[in-house]
Amino acid sequence: MATKTLSILFAASEVEGLIKSGGLADVAKALPKSLKDLGHEIHIAMPAYSAIPERDDAEVLLSSTLEHWPHTPYQVRSLSVEGITVLGIECADYFDRAEMYAENNQAYADNGERFAFFSAACLDMLPKLKIKPDVIHANDWHTGLLPYLLKKRYANDAYFSQVRSVLSVHNAVFKGIFHYDDIGCLSEFKTHYVPEAAVSHTHISMLKAGVQCADKINAVSPTYAKELLTELGSHGMASDFQAREPDLFGILNGCDYSEWSPETDTFIPKQFKANRISMVRGKKVCKAALQEEVGLPQKEVAMYGMVCRLTNQKGIHYLLPILEQFLKHDLQIVIVGTGDPVLAAQLTEIAAIHSDKFAFVEAYSNKLAHWIEASSDFFLMPSEFEPCGLNQIYSMSYGALPIVRAVGGLKDSVIDYDSDNENATGFSFINPEPTELLLVLMRSLLLYAQDLNEVKRIQLHAMKQNFSWSDAAEKYVEMYLD
């Protein structure tokens, strides 16, 4: 293990504990915390959105303007999460909005300008605050311009001469594609010719800029790193990732067990441990409470849970065609999520027809997310693609066996029962077809009906898996120093 103490700036568009829309926020809290626990000095940089409750009471560390953006002042607020200083970049023009990225399913038209400003301000504030990181760790397209600006604008700046950049790719489907004019406030883009970022004569990709310019690139699972080298897996960026293959790493995300452990979970009706008596009793109480909460009959049947964004990426289009056929059997399903209104309407209609077996909650509730993990016997993640995934790891911790499509981090973290009975932690299928999903669902249900003891054994084995962030953090440090 590396002994050198590093100073790290972790830049992300959202951080759990302050504001969250997806899994990136979980990583942006848990990984910095684990890096700090390893003895490294870390700051987090994020936009100080007006929706962050603590923002307006936080200390102002800096009030400044950008040299190339003189009419848009910004402030840096001192926020905190898990004892780590969060440098919140406040700018009313860009971050005082009702939401982070979009309203009414419509992305803000100036998102390119907003996050170009954020990246520029991140670098501008560092010498002014006398923070000199060894590593700047960017995440996804929102901060993809950080490595680019570091390499271009600050190439001859002595303050940044020893700074290395890393870009984590959490989901390459979101490339941050914008017209040159949308980010023309950055002087580097006024020429309308930036080969490192260009995707056409008129548009650039912030993600591509980061991939081209970062010193190291990290995919959030080993399998996803391999998938990024293909046209399908990279969503059209294969040549960019192939050109950087020697600098491309794949590190599986960890689980924040301080939040996702049935032994200490304050959300669930009854806590339980990874032994048979405790698990059976705890999950029984939790299942009954969930059934009452969502209006399902109090029955001891196989419970299937799902918590996700309602998008095709999450495999809803594999589930919908076979859902009613599967509901003919003795079981219950609870799905919680928001997203595509068409998918939500279809789920609502099926739930109305099968109200004794299927409940759909069109909302995101952290409490319900925890309840579903604790109550379910099986957890559905039939994703079309899944760079890492976290819910399958949470599920194992609670003894809810994940049913996954073997892609990305799902392939790296779930051992299929039919492939390895002894070490199994769930069930998986490969072909992206509704019929394939139905087959694996029936495999799980048949095992539940015929050998409940075996299901309990697998659940206990799954609960004993360890996907700690401390292990992942050590791999990140090795990458930083590589």
Curated annotation (Swiss-Prot):
Gene3D superfamilies: Glycogen Phosphorylase B
GO cellular component terms attached to this protein's record: cytosol
Pathway: Glycan biosynthesis; glycogen biosynthesis
InterPro entries assigned: Glyco_trans_1, GS/SS, Starch_synth_cat_dom
UniProt enzyme class: transferase
Single GO molecular function: alpha-1,4-glucan glucosyltransferase (ADP-glucose donor) activity
Record field: catalytic activity: [(1->4)-alpha-D-glucosyl](n) + ADP-alpha-D-glucose = [(1->4)-alpha-D-glucosyl](n+1) + ADP + H(+)
HAMAP family: Glycogen_synth
Protein name: Glycogen synthase
Gene: glgA
